[in-house]
Amino acid sequence: MAIAANKIAGIRAASCFDCFTAEMARRHNDANVLTLGARVTGAGLALKIIEQFLITSFDGGRHSRRVDMINAL
């Protein structure tokens, strides 16, 4: 799903499998869409990942250059 979503302008989708990857996707890549594997992620963990994704903000700074390059594609 993330691959398909990333074909849409302005979308920065990330497939996350734990809270750490969700946090880093937001902090470093300014991900704005979260995808989860239904067959490999239990309901309890999925809720924790979603919460972490929603409460985490983009760090900006040195990471902004990468996001700008992605947006320019």
Task: Mark where each language-model region is.
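Short glycine/serine/threonine-rich phosphate/pyrophosphate-binding segments
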Residues: 1-4
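C-terminal binding/interaction regions
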Residues: 8, 13, 19-73
